[in-house]
Structures are given as C-alpha cells and as structure tokens.
Amino acid sequence: IIIDHGMREMLELQRDVFYYVTMMNENYAQPNQPTATTEGVIRGCYKWGQLTPKMPKKPQKKTGAVTLMGSGAILTEVIKAAELLQADGIAVDIFSVTSWSELARDGMANDTTGNSIPYLTQQLLDSQGPIIAASDYVRAVPETVRAYVPANRTFRTLGTDGFGRSDTRAALRAFFQVDAASIAAAAHNALK
C-alpha cells in the first residue's frame, strides 16, 4: 500500500516527496490487514483489532481497558501482549503504526493551520484506557506523537534506547522491555 501510494505520488502526480521503507530481517507471518484500512496505512496508523476481556483465571482487582500501539516487528509482540492482557480480564484496542513520522507531521501541520483534529487524535478517540506505544526504535520516536494523544489519556512509550548490545532477539527485547511480557506489564502498571 505504501509503496504503491508513494510511486503514484512521485510519478503520476509529480510531487517532490521522499519515501523510505524500513526493511526487517525477522521472519514472521504478516498479520492480515483489516478491511478499510488503506487510508490508515498511508496516514500512519490504523486500528488492527480489539480484544474483549476474558474471565481471568485468577480473580484480580485490576480490570479495565488499555490501548496498545506497535510498529514494525514489535507489532507481533504487541499482539501477544494484548492476548496476555485479555486473559487477565482487560479489554485491549490494538493499533498498528506504519509511520510515527507521518503521524507527527500530520499533528504538526494541524498545529500550524488548526483546521482539524490531528489524525492520530481522531483514531484514538474511540479507544479506551491508558496508551502504551511500543517500538523497536528508541523511545524518542513514539514520543514525537505525544502532543497528539487525547488530553485525558496516559501515554507511555517503550523503545530500544541504548547501544552496543548483542544477543538473541528474545533476550534483547526482554532487556529493552519491548517483549510481550514487558508490554503487558507496562499496561498493568498504567492501570494502577
């Protein structure tokens, strides 16, 4: 979708724009694209799905709802975290972020013109609870959209800040706290 849109914009419409595509070297099944999400893919995010709470195996005081946002290969960890939260009796809205930069650009353009509500804000209005944004970039990348999160919502970012580490993907994701268990733990903490 993004490559097709970019090629049309550059070649057919002759716009002076720059596109880049980040490639990952991890093998994973690409999640199915929900219907009617083409605009969201191009504009930076779309609602991937929603999980309704199951009765938790162990009764807990914590229930409620959270919103998880994930990009790139970390989206698979976000989906696993959502399943863990669902098993704990928590409702989860899941958003796939295709471009933190595009979301930030849209928000900044809106700051300048003030003509409409930023796209990210619109998308998050129908979700619930604290928002956990996970990325395999440094936390500063998802932080670029903080200003466009609905005002009454807690927003926590998770990323891979640091350098010089070498290990397995699983170990590195656990170390940087962007694995499913860490994302679920961040959501539980945000619900306190």
Regions found by a protein language model. Give the residues of each.
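Thiamine diphosphate
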Residues: 1-192
